[in-house]
Amino acid sequence: MKTYTYSKQDLSFIEQLSQAYCKDPFSYLGLHQAGDVSVIRVFLPEATTVKILSADGQILSEALKIDDSGLFVAQLSQQYSSLNYRLRVGYSLAEIDLEDPYRFTSSLLPMDNWLLAEGTHLRPYEILGAHLKTQEGVSGVHFSVWAPNARRVSVVGDFNYWDGRVNPMRFHAESGIWDIFLPNVEKGALYKFEILDSNGNIRLKSDPYAFASQFRPDTASVVTGLPEKIEVDAKLRHANEPDQPISIYEVHLGSWRRHLENNYWLNYEEIANELIPYVKDMGFTHIELLPITEYPFDGSWGYQPTGLYSPTSRFGSPDDLRTLIRKAHEAGINVILDWVVGHFPTDSHGLTEFDGSHLYEHQDPREGYHQDWNTLIFNYGRHEVFNYLSSNALYWTERFGIDGLRVDAVSSMIYRDYSRKDGEWIPNQYGGRENLEALDFLRRTNRMLKKEGHGAVVIAEESTSFAGITHSPTENGVGFDYKWNMGWMNDTLRYMSLDPIYRQYHHDWMTFGMMYQYSEKFVLPLSHDEVVHGKCSILGKMSGDCWQKFANLRAYYGYMWGYPGKKLLFMGNEFAQGREWNYNESLDWFLLGEQGGGWHKGVLNWVRDLNRTYQKYPALYQLDYDPAGFEWLVVDDWQQSVFAFERKAKNGESVIVVSNFTPVVRHNYRIGVRQDGTYTEILNSDAAYYEGSNVGNYGEIECEAIESHGKPFSIELSIPPLSTIFIACQPKPKEAVEAEQDIVKMAEVAMQKALKPTKKTVSVKAKAHKKAHKNKK
């Protein structure tokens, strides 16, 4: 074909393609019918020649370059409804054979489009994003992205020299999705979506559904396979249940431990080899990871993510992360992920104004902008946004084996007026302050995970008294499994900061939590938020001199581990790091050596033994959320700042926890108990092993049948200064109790017999009485 007659269609598409605003490239490029013949149109701006090859490599036609912009047209000698062909493309320095992306049909099914538009696709990440696949025997990558208001979307990457003119995508008007299959693109390729918005602006965006991303400061997405599903270990997931011991070690992977020589991060493999044995030895049951979804700014700690489906590349590949989680599971440790779905950053490569419109966020800043964090708030009421977020929960549990999600900043999600003044927020449709769309998102996501998550749990960081956070949606609750008890944490830390002489006036700060203990399923958190921004370390919050600070801390941890609720401790707190947490440095592990003077090692040993005791005695965890599992024994001794309570197991066994928050030893302190038995001191925060003063009860404690505190029995204790002690009760065996009861009955019978008068005694008494009566007369 040496001459070519331009049609109006040609002229229109030449302009659209050369100016890069073609919205429907598949209607023109590739194989098409033209009267009695077929034509193949190819747009390659940098090419000099194009030949059409058959499947076996024969030249079918040589294309004519009909425009300097790079449009080639080849006419075939006959009609083809479909044709397996290739392109031989000549460039200035070489000639290479290529597949034509515009000969492949869309792999998006009508049902996919319908479900995605409706926001009910359970696993949209199996469709959207970049997926390695084979079409018609050709390997490549299927790209798809939701951008309903864009004029044109192209895939750009190192495979097409980041030229947005080369691979414009197919638009599906019914769903707003763009897609294209690019042959011969391989795993590891870098890519983005180049979006022409309705105002003519070019936006270069990372893939919202990317499974891997470049290392910051670069922002491209990386082609990688969708991770395979992880087989769920039912035994591990059972460890998430409310009647199981849950002790969570909260970790920031970038600062738990670093290479000493260059202060650089450990990678996922190194973390697995060091962190997991440590956590296992310390007796923690769960690891909670601060956010590891891709994020651009180290100083956000991961709480401003740009890639919810992409594990951060800071520490390695997605497969490396899966290996870390697998090794944790092999050690019997569950893994919880901090999940940030309340807001996202304003970085230009991220979700902000994704297709030129406010696609993921609200348009009105009174709904869509978070002024505290300079972030944007998701529009939960939009079907596709809901689907994007909700399915992400399933992605992490199914594809990485994550055992639970801790949802960040729930309060900021469910209140429209969160951290806003009057006039800075918009009421809901009923005039209220609740974000009904966010609540619906949380309820539906929690319900979905209950059904599909195979025992994965969801934990709320919710700092208000919003009712029903852990209640079922069928009871008008939100459906979380657990909620952080921020009130308990704030009250008790405030108490511990006081000089002991003033604690007597604020006794209720340690007891008030029981007033609402059974309103939710609580986790007691000492998280990363409490050791940053000038708040001091947990050790730094304790009052007193060095000895008192460490004694206070050990006593406080003991009180916490005895108190109802699951436990959470941020890294470094287990050995009483003295300074605030710094995300850019390793923890101060040197404190466990001679430089720590033994104090920090003592706290480490105490936390380890607390965890082991906690797991050993069901009384300390089985009935956390049942009033039958807790009873105050001493609640009103404010003058001596002593607290005592009994924790009970389902089988009736119990552990007594006693705390003394003054530096005065309480000798001969009597506490009433409900049953006779053998009482043994099993833990004492003042033991020399923990660097205490070694005051205690040294094993077995005598139980006496002396009433105290309304109980029929009592024990007399020596309560060390600034301490918490744990006392296990082994009730007397039933046979022994019955034998004692028999002895008591026999003694009572003998006593009654001894006191009952005999016939001779009665006769003598009668005669004496008769004689006395006669004398009286």
UniProtKB/Swiss-Prot annotation:
UniProt entry tagged with the keyword Metal-binding: no
GO cellular component labels: cytosol
Keywords, comma-separated and alphabetical: Carbohydrate metabolism, Glycogen biosynthesis, Glycogen metabolism, Glycosyltransferase, Transferase
Catalytic reactions on record: Transfers a segment of a (1->4)-alpha-D-glucan chain to a primary hydroxy group in a similar glucan chain
Enzyme category, top tier: transferase
Domain of life the protein comes from: Bacteria
Pathway(s) per entry: Glycan biosynthesis; glycogen biosynthesis
UniProt record, GO biological process: glycogen biosynthetic process
Classification via InterPro entries: A-amylase/branching_C (IPR006048), Branching_enzy (IPR037439), GlgB (IPR006407), GlgB_N (IPR054169), GlgB_N_E_set_prok (IPR044143), Glyco_hydro_13_cat_dom (IPR006047), Glyco_hydro_13_N (IPR004193), Glyco_hydro_b (IPR013780)
Any one GO MF annotation of this record: hydrolase activity, hydrolyzing O-glycosyl compounds
Family annotation (Pfam families): Alpha-amylase, Alpha-amylase_C, CBM_48, GlgB_N
Enzyme Commission number, as recorded: 2.4.1.18
Coiled coil residues, start to end: none
Active site: D408 (nucleophile), E461 (proton donor)
Subunit structure, interactors included: Monomer.
Purpose: Catalyzes the formation of the alpha-1,6-glucosidic linkages in glycogen by scission of a 1,4-alpha-linked oligosaccharide from growing alpha-1,4-glucan chains and the subsequent attachment of the oligosaccharide to the alpha-1,6 position.
Annotated family: Belongs to the glycosyl hydrolase 13 family. GlgB subfamily.
Protein name: 1,4-alpha-glucan branching enzyme GlgB
Protein source organism: Actinobacillus pleuropneumoniae serotype 3 (strain JL03)
Gene designation per UniProt: glgB
